[in-house]
Regions:
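Alpha/beta catalytic barrel-like cores
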Residues: 1-141, 145, 236-302
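Catalytic alpha/beta core domains of metabolic enzymes, predominantly
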Residues: 151, 165, 169-246
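General "foldedness" signal
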Residues: 63, 88, 128, 155-157, ...
Length: 302
């Protein structure tokens, strides 16, 4: 059994994105994998199944492997748009698909999350309009922008969240891909984590976090961020009010011995956070999308 502090840091942390690069599975085998994973002993690490809203209709005939005890928990992914003019109808289409799909499969499918790329010209009014459309739906909403605009986007989301009686909006940071240029610098990742912590904006991540600790990988010809680095830096930075230099040092650490977990404490070097505080900080440091559920958990094995 993993140490309590490790369980706190990684509980429901992996959104399974099997249909996306580099795995690129077809819908049916990806769903079969997810149905298997939610019945395994490591299911405590698993969160949602990333599913584009355009694939909802195709899923309807492949739900026999899910039931009320083992529902398909979905993070719905909206389509990519370049401008607000294109974003508004794309979002409305995604919203209608979510409403319809949820109604048709009550008890077997639970749409817990929505993710979508924001166009560069989005403003506060558009965010409020989009957030308001979800009404009473109980789902978490995350908006993605390029990593070099993360801090500005998080500030905009915080401005929205500061208003009374509004849906809290989160930020989605892309942390990698299949080519070297898809990986943001430690400074960009750290800046986003600090901005999210200081503004109390929920943050999730996607891509490039297959391995626990930062390392060079031949398949992408660059260093990949580690999920222990990123999630760990997120909770420690929030707990200790780190600056950009301190958080970059943790994000760039490639020594697995720097990380230690026991029943009461997670530590990175001399910095510590108690297990109960990890639970509290994880309300804002939420999850990461990965096309593999096997790689992250296998790499954690001693």
């Amino acid at each position: 059994m993993p140490a309590a502090s490790l369980r706190a840091l990684l509980a429901h942390s992996i959104d399974y994105a099997g249909m996306f690069p580099p795995c690129n599975l077809a819908l049916e085998p990806a769903l079969q994998n997810h149905a298997k994973y939610i019945r395994e002993s490591d299911a405590w690490m698993l969160s949602n199944f990333i599913l584009p809203t355009g694939q909802f209709a195709a899923v309807s005939g492949t739900l026999a492997q899910f039931d009320r005890k083992h529902p398909l928990r979905v993070s719905a992914l909206g389509s990519k748009t370049e401008t607000v003019a294109a974003f508004r109808p794309a979002f409305e289409e995604a919203f209608e698909a979510i409403r319809k799909f949820s109604t048709e499969h009550t008890g077997v499918v639970s749409i817990d999350q929505f993710e979508m790329l924001l166009p560069g010209d989005v403003d506060l009014a558009i965010l409020a309009e989009a957030a308001g459309m979800f009404g009473e739906m109980k789902l978490h909403v995350f908006w993605e922008t390029p990593a070099d605009t993360a801090e500005r986007a998080i500030a905009l989301l915080a401005q929205h969240n500061s208003k009374k009686n509004v849906r809290v909006l989160g930020y989605k940071l892309r942390t990698g891909g299949v080519t070297a240029d898809a990986f943001p610098s430690a400074a960009h990742v750290g800046g986003a984590l600090i901005a999210a912590a200081r503004n109390r904006v929920p943050i999730k991540f996607t891509a490039g976090l297959h391995h626990p600790v930062r390392q060079f990988r031949d398949e992408v010809k660059t260093k990949m961020h580690g999920f222990l680095n990123v999630l760990g830096a997120g909770v420690l930075a929030a707990e200790h009010d780190w600056d950009e230099g301190q958080i970059s040092r943790m994000l760039e650490d490639e020594n697995a011995d720097s990380f230690s977990f026991d029943e009461t404490i997670f530590a990175w070097r001399e910095w510590e956070i108690a297990t109960d505080r990890i639970h509290a900080r994880r309300k804002l440091i939420t999850s990461f999308g990965s096309c593999s559920f096997d790689e992250p958990r296998e790499d954690l094995q001693p």
